[in-house]
Swiss-Prot record:
The gene is flgH. PANTHER family: FLAGELLAR L-RING PROTEIN (PTHR34933:SF1). Its main location: membrane. HAMAP family: FlgH (MF_00415). This is Flagellar L-ring protein. One of its GO terms (molecular function) is cytoskeletal motor activity.
């Protein structure tokens, strides 16, 4: 009898456990929270900007922290810089001291090292010259677009945006990073901002791998071109 009651109790517990909804995993909760669409509040609010926005109507323009937008860099396709510098310093000095007599007499002493007699005459001459030339030329081209995130909304309505993109290739990785400040009025209806409209822009394009290592000088070359090198 006791064994039969135990079997019924175990079966009831299994049935109750099957009726309980499964607990979502942390990944599921995170995805639901990230992919949740923003709701339109009925209470009107005004964004501190030159153009007021009411939350009664949903807008696709990214104006709040965490929203994303695209920043094409087609308008800044090429930049170049060149610098030349040259310096030359020359100095020549010569000194002659000749005394024919000392207190009315002409000293004449034999030179113990040979080569004639010692006298009161002395002379010095020296030349020094320094010359340096330097030339630097730099050019780059960057074309494409990157999606950035609104990192911060300032009290005046401007947005701080930053994002980076990593491209993994079979010979290394390439990094494209852009950060800067954007006005809310410069955001187009398709959520794009030209790179020429980004204030305090910091654009980084670098990479890792064999190609990036090939463009760097070796450790011995870096030693000889160091600013601490005296020559």
């Amino acid at each position: 009898m006791n064994r039969l009651l135990s079997v019924f109790a175990l079966g009831g517990a299994v049935l109750l456990a099957g009726c309980v909804a499964p607990t979502p995993s942390p990944t599921t909760r995170t995805m639901r929270r990230c992919c949740r669409a923003p709701r339109c509040r009925q209470r009107p609010t005004t964004v501190r900007s030159t153009r007021p926005v009411s939350s009664r109507t949903c807008t696709a323009t990214a104006r709040r922290s965490g929203w994303v937008t695209s920043s094409p860099s087609r308008s800044m396709s090429a930049t170049s810089a060149s610098k030349n510098a040259g310096s030359q310093i020359a100095k020549t000095s010569k000194t002659d001291i000749g005394l024919t007599s000392l207190f009315g007499s002409t000293p004449n002493t034999n030179n113990p090292f040979g080569g004639g007699d010692l006298s009161l005459e002395a002379g010095y001459s020296g030349d020094r010259a320094t010359k340096g030339d330097s030339k630097a030329t730099q050019g780059n081209t960057l074309t494409g677009s990157i999606t950035v995130t609104v990192a911060e909304v300032l009290p005046n309505g401007n947005h701080r945006r930053a994002r980076q993109k990593w491209l993994t290739l079979n010979t290394g990785e390439e990094l494209v990073r852009i950060a800067g400040m954007v006005r809310a009025d410069d955001i187009a209806t398709d959520n794009t901002v030209p790179s020429t409209r980004v204030a305090d822009a910091r654009i980084t394009y670098s990479g890792t791998g064999s190609f990036a290592d090939a463009s760097q000088p070796g450790w011995l070359d870096r030693f000889f071109i160091s600013p601490l090198w005296p020559f």
